[in-house]
């Protein structure tokens, strides 16, 4: 029985290895050289920890050199930590005069990782509460909320539960109810590709394969949009996480999925929010159908919408400058 099971596992692993997503040769060559290079510093602001519900939560606050127009609070997507934000995007926000705060969710980055999540599950509202505690520690009264994917859902929870602490809401490629039976569901074939990718590059554990896995994920997230992935930038950021932080928590994706399902629909509450809202979604998103953001734009009072051509479930490098200009205009409404 043991030998038979082992044979099955080997066969399945071989099939996944042969059929799973791969990356082009030029990306492999770039990754091979990056592994041997010196990793630059990715954390340039003031850092610290807060304690929220017995979790130690890591944050970074980057303040402009000149006058501060306001504060932007960033909420990252599923399985990612604070370092998932493109450096060029952070630099643009700070140059535009906005103090920019990013933080590691529970179970990611330098924040506490916990087992036994099933016994004491947390919700998206708890993640939003962690962000409020960070603002309290920095004596910041209000912030502009910007969330991507899962982060868009957390930002929505913040706007719903702490409206007096929110200036604006920007929800990017997200949903107000991810299991809405009246909307197209999350792309299951895409999820299968993610699983295949994880298996393909986890059979042999090495820094190179971790980098390859993350670059391949970015290529999958691009969908059928036509733009180049920043292989060097993604690889350097991942390598920094491996060598200078705690790496990646393999269990956090499941915990975050459970938090999403526990949180359920936010439609009723979103119909009542009063903060200016901007809804953004890529028209080539292979993961969350754009109809989810269309529903958000429909139910949030006065919400503005931007449907972006040639954008998947990621922020393309070539769009960072124009996206920053759009956001700064939105922020100026408050």
Question: Where are the regions a protein language model picked out?
Answer:
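Flexible "cap/lid" loop of the alpha/beta hydrolase fold
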Residues: 169-203
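Catalytic active-site module of serine/aspartate enzymes centered on a nucleophile-bearing elbow/loop
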Residues: 303-334
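An N-terminal hydrophobic leader/cap segment in hydrolases
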Residues: 11-49
């Amino acid at each position: 029985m043991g030998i038979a099971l082992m044979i099955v596992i080997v066969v399945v692993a071989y099939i996944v290895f042969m059929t799973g997503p791969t990356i082009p040769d030029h990306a492999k060559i770039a990754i091979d050289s990056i592994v041997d290079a010196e990793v630059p510093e990715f954390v340039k602001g003031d850092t610290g920890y807060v304690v929220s519900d017995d979790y130690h939560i890591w944050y970074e606050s980057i303040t402009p050199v000149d006058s501060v127009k306001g504060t932007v609070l960033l909420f990252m997507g599923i399985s990612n930590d604070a370092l998932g934000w493109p450096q060029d995007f952070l630099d643009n926000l700070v140059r535009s005069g906005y103090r920019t705060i990013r933080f590691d969710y529970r179970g990611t980055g330098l924040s506490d990782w916990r087992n036994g999540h099933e016994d004491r599950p947390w919700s998206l509202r708890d993640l939003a509460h962690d962000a409020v505690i960070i603002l309290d520690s920095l004596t910041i009264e209000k912030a502009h909320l910007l969330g991507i994917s899962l982060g868009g859902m957390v930002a929505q929870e913040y706007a719903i539960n702490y409206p007096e602490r929110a200036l604006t809401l920007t929800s990017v490629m997200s949903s107000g109810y991810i299991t809405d039976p009246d909307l197209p569901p999350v792309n299951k074939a895409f999820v299968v590709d993610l699983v295949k990718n994880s298996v393909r590059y986890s059979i042999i554990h090495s820094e190179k394969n971790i980098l390859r896995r993350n670059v391949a994920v970015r290529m999958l997230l691009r969908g059928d949009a036509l733009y180049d992935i920043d292989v060097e930038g993604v690889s350097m950021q991942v390598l920094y996480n491996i060598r200078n932080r705690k790496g990646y928590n393999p269990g956090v994706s499941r915990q975050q999925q459970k938090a999403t399902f526990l949180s359920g629909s936010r439609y009723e509450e979103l119909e009542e929010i009063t903060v200016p809202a901007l809804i953004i979604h890529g028209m080539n998103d292979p993961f969350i159908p754009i109809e989810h953001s269309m529903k958000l734009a429909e139910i949030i009072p006065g919400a503005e919408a931007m449907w972006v051509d040639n954008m998947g479930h990621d922020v393309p490098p070539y769009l960072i400058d124009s996206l920053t200009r759009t956001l700064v205009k939105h922020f100026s409404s408050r």
